[in-house]
From Swiss-Prot:
Record GO terms (molecular function): 1,4-dihydroxy-2-naphthoyl-CoA thioesterase activity; fatty acyl-CoA hydrolase activity
The protein, known as: 1,4-dihydroxy-2-naphthoyl-CoA hydrolase
Pathway assignment: Cofactor biosynthesis; phylloquinone biosynthesis; Quinol/quinone metabolism; 1,4-dihydroxy-2-naphthoate biosynthesis; 1,4-dihydroxy-2-naphthoate from chorismate: step 7/7
Lineage: Bacteria, Bacillati, Cyanobacteriota, Cyanophyceae, Nostocales
Keywords for the protein's UniProt record, in alphabetical order: Hydrolase
UniProt entry tagged with the keyword Hydrolase: yes
UniProt-listed InterPro entries: 4-hydroxybenzoyl-CoA_TE, DHNA_CoA_hydrolase, HotDog_dom_sf
Organism: Trichormus variabilis (strain ATCC 29413 / PCC 7937)
Length: 148
């Protein structure tokens, strides 16, 4: 089951044309990521200031399907998934009412903050990822039963 984050588009999110500036949609997605961590019980202060471990974003992409304007009320739906022993990916869908207006992906790699070398994901992040994996699997099982 995706995590949902509600957000109002602010004037500061927009560019001279009055639409959301392309890079700001990633910041808005990151807000959703942070909210999902916080909701699962992860201390953001400890997570982002851990002197031994960091989770840099090594890939990001966005597809814009419709423009967003100041005052728009959006819902960010995100699903994180483990894609290796040391990395995970988050898929985001941004909705205005029931209309999909943008899609984004961020890929994160777990590194030792001192040596900058890859390391396995922390137990805390694995538990966060597993929570979404289990919820998603349960939703898929329910859908499969409905089809039968």
């Amino acid at each position: 089951m995706p995590f949902t984050y509600h957000r109002t588009i602010h004037f500061q999110d927009t560019d001279a044309a009055g639409v959301v500036y392309f890079a700001n949609i990633l910041s808005i997605c990151h807000e959703g990521y942070e909210a999902s961590l916080r909701t699962s019980g992860i201390s953001l202060k400890e997570f982002f200031t851990n002197p031994n471990m960091a989770f840099p974003i090594v890939h990001a992409s966005v597809d814009f399907l419709r423009p967003l304007f100041c005052g728009d009320q959006v819902i960010i739906s995100l699903v994180p998934q483990k894609i290796g022993a040391e990395k995970f990916e988050i898929n985001y869908e941004i909705y205005l009412a029931d209309v999909l207006v943008a899609k984004a992906v961020t890929r994160h790699v777990c590194i030792d903050a001192n040596t900058r070398s890859k390391q396995e994901l922390s137990t805390e992040i694995i538990q966060w990822l597993d929570g979404y994996r289990k919820e998603t699997e349960e939703v898929e099982r329910r859908k499969a039963r409905e089809v039968v």
